A protein has these predicted regions:
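Bacterial N-terminal signal peptides that target proteins for export
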Residues: 2-13
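Hydrophobic helical h-region of N-terminal Sec-dependent signal peptides
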Residues: 14-19
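C-terminal motif of bacterial Sec signal peptides marking the signal peptidase cleavage site
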Residues: 21-24
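A short, solvent-exposed, low-complexity linear motif enriched for acidic/polar residues
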Residues: 26-238
Length: 238
């Protein structure tokens, strides 16, 4: 693991790739906006779905993508924690649920987080921490039940006393020959690397109709540095 400043830089880059295209069903059929005050005490659910691509191509694990020059790249893991999720507007609806989003997962459930028990009403956006909040990061996997993604020991650095906020692992084919021989591993963690993300979006939570939004993630943009891309051959570890 490199310096906190270096990892903070990667965390900010990850937020840049999470310049989401937001879509989905979040209003009632008539388009009526309902405030939390109008349905006081009623709860509803929201599914946040993450849809990944690599440039213009659909994203998947173990698939080769053109990178820079002759190089090709494939990924075995792209995952990140999100915590402190809140719907924002005139009022707020907070969730204490944590999510571990695995864009290379084999199931749709690994790319989603389902939030339950949210106060019904109309909201104008969603906020979350990309990573693990300092309060939660003081804890360790043994402090959480098995159903909580923060219970996973593979997502925690014992020596650093921190969760691994993001992990991007894969292989590079240096010559575009079909031989993926060079590995790389990018990981971020520690309190300085958690980043707050705010996305504007009309969201209506109703008891009778679970809502959903989709966040579009371009993984290629994570590696972009000006007019070129991060050198995964010269600097494969972070």
């Amino acid at each position: 693991m490199k310096s906190n400043l270096y990892n903070r830089w990667f965390s900010v880059l990850l937020v840049c790739l999470l310049i989401f295209v937001v879509s989905g069903c979040s209003k009632d059929e008539g388009g009526t906006q309902v405030s939390p005050d109008e349905i006081l005490g009623v709860k509803g659910d929201l599914t946040v779905q993450f849809s990944a691509r690599f440039g213009t191509e659909p994203f998947a694990a173990a698939k080769g993508y053109a990178y820079q020059g002759k190089q090709k790249v494939m990924f075995s893991k792209v995952e990140f924690y999100i915590t402190d999720i809140q719907l924002v507007g005139t009022n707020r609806a907070a969730s204490d649920q944590a999510g571990l989003i695995n864009l290379t997962g084999s199931t749709e459930a690994s790319k989603n987080i389902s939030l339950t028990g949210l106060a019904s009403g109309h909201y104008t956006g969603i906020e979350f921490t990309l990573g693990v909040t300092p309060a939660l990061n003081k804890k360790s996997p043994r402090d959480f039940p098995p159903s909580n993604p923060l219970s996973l020991s593979g997502g925690f650095w014992e020596d650093w006393g921190s969760y691994i906020f993001t992990q991007i692992l894969g292989l590079v084919d240096p010559e575009g020959s079909g031989h993926f021989t060079n590995g790389f591993a990018i990981q971020t963690g520690t309190d300085e690397c958690s980043v707050k993300v705010t996305i504007e979006k009309d969201i209506t939570i109703k008891e009778s109709k679970p809502a959903s939004i989709t966040l579009d993630v371009d993984v290629l943009q994570f590696f972009k540095q000006g007019n070129t891309y991060y050198d995964l051959i010269a600097d494969p570890l972070s």
